[in-house]
Swiss-Prot record:
GO terms for biological process: biological process involved in symbiotic interaction; filamentous growth; growth of unicellular organism as a thread of attached cells; mating; negative regulation of growth of unicellular organism as a thread of attached cells; phenotypic switching; positive regulation of phenotypic switching. This is White-opaque regulator 2. It comes from Candida albicans (strain SC5314 / ATCC MYA-2876) (Yeast). The keyword DNA repair does not apply. It holds the Pfam family Zn_clus. Residues 1-203, 336-402 are annotated as: Disordered. Residues 1-24, 67-86, 121-144, 387-401 have a biased composition (Polar residues). Transcriptional regulator of the switch between 2 heritable states, the white and opaque states. These 2 cell types differ in many characteristics, including cell structure, mating competence, and virulence. Each state is heritable for many generations, and switching between states occurs stochastically, at low frequency. WOR2 is necessary for the stability of the opaque state phenotypic switching from the white to the opaque phase is a necessary step for mating. Plays a role in cell adhesion and pseudohyphal growth. Residues 166-184 have a biased composition (Pro residues). GO terms for molecular function: DNA binding; DNA-binding transcription factor activity, RNA polymerase II-specific; zinc ion binding. It comes from the Eukaryota. Induction: Expression is induced by HAP43 under low iron conditions. Residues 305-332 bind DNA.
Length: 446
């Protein structure tokens, strides 16, 4: 931060620079009040000091004093508001950074000199009644604008009131501006419509437009013919109307896009499912036809001619010779007599079938023969043996009704286990009755 010079340094540096420059320096003022006089007014005597050149430096400050520009004139001064400048042109310069400190000091000193020059009379004596030199210098420092420095300014911005063009009406100014391109309009429209359309990001990208978009998205871009820029209506009103119309078009186009998005795949899926179903049905029918064809061929191999049966082709069964043999110039060997052929054997599972009555009778006869053979070897009591045979035959006839109730597997197990009738041979009637009882029980279990 630069340090401003004190008031005493400013007073010591004031003075006339020379006749060559346009700035006249007023020497430092010393006010002496007349105490011995009886006059009410106080006279201020101005003592002039030795004038300095423009490039001379003060012993107390290393700053140089610049020249005052010729186009700046002070016309009016007021103690409350400062100095007002009545000139139509002002020059604002951007000082160089190397001499910023010098410019600030020189501007303050020059403003003080110009203020004193305006207040002083031609004779160099000024009368001050209520304002002291220090207050006047401070006011001039705060009110007078900074004059340009003597060094070269890098950039200058000239503002002249007389050269300002007259501002055209807003209607003509708006007509002179070119209309904005459609992508920029869409770039402002889509962020407003994005919350209303949840599928916006899937179809439209605001910055660019390519041919991959659907056709109904090009409608907001095209402007209607009654909104062309060559008309006299303001462009911003036309843009607002086009924005509203584009929003309406988008609202009208959105249900169609929604319908196309959600309904289209259902039709596609239905078509695909129907095609797959028809393909499966065709395959099943082909398989069935192949199976039926094989079955038909197998059935007709016995009814066709012998030549077709050897060739393993379908015979038309024309008699006496088939048409296939005549067409292929083969000798037809004739047909086989099917009445002499045995019936086809069927491989059935007979494990669960019930035995027939003839088989049961044969098994019973075998059992009786085995029992009779064992009893005939006994020579001790023939009468008992005949009684045993009769009792066995009677019990066997009574047990025929129980054969249907006993399973065949259980009967086979009993028949496989032989009964020992030749253990203890009984010589009494009680022994013979025991043998008969054993045989009857065995018959019941069969």
């Amino acid at each position: 931060m630069t340090q401003l010079p004190s008031v005493s340094e400013l007073i010591n540096r004031t003075g006339s620079i020379g006749s060559s420059s346009n700035i006249t320096r007023v020497p430092p003022m010393t006010t002496t009040s007349a105490t011995n006089t009886t006059t009410a007014a106080t006279a201020t005597t101005v003592t002039s000091t030795t004038p300095r050149s423009e490039n001379s430096y003060s012993p107390n400050s290393p700053y140089s004093l610049p020249t005052r520009p010729s186009n700046t004139s002070l016309t009016n001064y007021s103690a409350g508001s400062g100095i007002t400048v009545a000139s139509s042109s002002f020059q604002f310069s951007q000082p160089s950074p190397g001499r910023s400190k010098h410019n600030s000091t020189s501007s303050q000193s020059s403003s003080g000199d110009s203020f004193q020059q305006h207040q002083s009379n031609p004779s160099g004596v000024s009368m001050s009644s209520n304002t002291s030199p220090r207050t006047s210098i401070v006011q001039s420092m705060s009110s007078v604008p900074t004059p340009p420095s003597t060094g070269p300014a890098p950039q200058q911005f000239v503002y002249q009131e007389s050269q300002l063009p007259v501002q055209p009406p807003p209607q003509q100014q708006q007509l002179q501006q070119p209309p904005p391109p459609p992508p920029q309009q869409q770039q402002h429209i889509y962020p407003q419509q994005q919350p209303n359309f949840p599928y916006h990001n899937n179809f439209v990208s605001p910055p660019t437009y390519t041919t991959a978009y659907p056709q109904y998205y090009y409608q907001p871009v095209m402007t209607p013919p009654h909104h062309q820029p060559h008309q006299q209506a303001p462009i911003h009103l036309a843009n607002n109307v086009s924005i509203l119309q584009s929003q309406a078009v988008m609202q009208n186009a959105y249900p169609t896009t929604h319908y196309l998005q959600h309904v289209g795949p259902h039709h596609i899926y239905a078509n695909v499912n129907s095609q797959v179903y028809y393909q499966d049905m065709a395959r099943e029918e082909a398989n069935k036809a192949l199976i039926n064809k094989r079955r038909i061929i197998k059935r007709r191999t016995r009814t066709g001619c012998l030549t077709c049966r050897k060739r393993r082709i379908k015979c038309d069964e024309r008699k006496p010779t088939c048409f296939n043999c005549e067409r292929s110039k083969k000798s037809c060997l004739g047909y086989q007599d099917l009445s002499k052929l045995p019936p086809r054997k069927r491989n059935r599972d007979t494990s669960l079938d019930l035995p027939d009555g003839n088989q049961q009778q044969q098994q019973q006869q075998q059992n009786q023969q085995s029992i009779v053979g064992g009893a005939g070897n006994v020579s001790d009591e023939p009468h008992n043996e005949t009684h045993q045979i009769t009792s066995i035959s009677g019990s066997s006839t009574n047990s025929r009704n129980l054969d249907m109730m006993i399973p065949q597997s259980f009967r086979n197990n009993i028949s496989s286990q032989p009964i020992n009738f030749y253990g203890p041979v009984a010589t009494t009637a009680s022994g013979a009755s025991a043998v008969i009882n054993r045989v009857s029980v065995a018959d019941l279990l069969k």
